[in-house]
C-alpha cells in the first residue's frame, strides 16, 4: 500500500496502473492499459524479496471469498439512479441491506457503490460499463456465505426494476 498510487483490477485479471511507481530508485511509468502480467510479476518479486514461496504468501492472506452476478436487461440509467438514491443515506442502505449484513462501517462511490459492513462483509453495486446490466459483487469470510449473500442481494435488486 502506498500513498497516492492508483491502481485498478478487473475480475478477468486485467490490471491498470494510473500512477508512476518508484521503488529502490527505479521508476515504472503509469500503465494506462489493461495488463495481466504486472500482478504476476508483483507476486513473484514479493515472494523473492521475502524468501518464501507463493504458497507462503497466500497463507499469509486473510481468508476472503467473493461471489458476483448481474441482473441482465437492467437499463444503465436506472442503475445509476437507484445506486445514487441509495448512496444518499446510510439509513437507506441499512434498511435495504442491514438485514443481510448489519451496520454499515463505510461506503465508497468511486465505482458504483461499495458498502462495507461492521461484520466485514462487502456489497458492491455498479452498472455494467458495456451492457444494460446491474452488477453485484460480494465479499465474505466463506465461499458459501459470499454466494448466499450475492443471491440475497440480487433478490433485493430485482425489486428495483
Regions found by a protein language model. Name each.
Residues 1-129, 133-135, 140-161:
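Phosphate-binding and adjacent anionic-ligand microenvironments
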Amino acid at each position: 500500500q502506498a500513498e497516492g498510487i492508483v491502481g485498478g483490477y478487473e475480475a478477468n485479471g486485467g490490471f491498470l496502473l494510473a500512477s508512476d511507481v518508484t521503488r529502490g530508485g527505479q521508476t515504472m511509468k503509469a500503465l494506462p492499459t489493461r495488463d495481466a502480467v504486472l500482478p504476476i510479476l508483483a507476486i513473484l518479486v514479493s515472494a523473492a524479496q521475502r524468501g518464501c514461496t507463493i504458497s507462503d504468501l497466500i497463507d499469509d492472506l486473510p481468508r476472503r471469498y467473493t461471489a458476483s452476478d448481474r441482473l441482465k436487461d437492467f437499463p444503465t440509467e436506472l442503475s445509476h439512479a437507484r445506486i445514487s438514491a441509495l448512496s444518499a443515506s446510510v439509513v437507506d442502505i441499512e434498511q435495504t441491506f442491514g438485514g443481510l449484513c448489519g451496520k454499515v462501517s463505510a461506503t465508497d462511490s468511486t465505482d458504483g457503490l461499495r458498502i462495507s459492513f461492521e461484520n466485514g462483509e462487502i456489497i458492491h453495486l455498479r452498472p455494467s460499463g458495456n451492457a444494460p446490466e446491474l452488477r453485484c459483487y460480494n465479499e465474505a469470510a466463506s465461499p458459501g456465505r459470499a454466494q448466499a449473500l450475492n443471491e440475497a442481494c440480487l433478490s433485493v435488486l430485482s425489486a428495483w426494476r
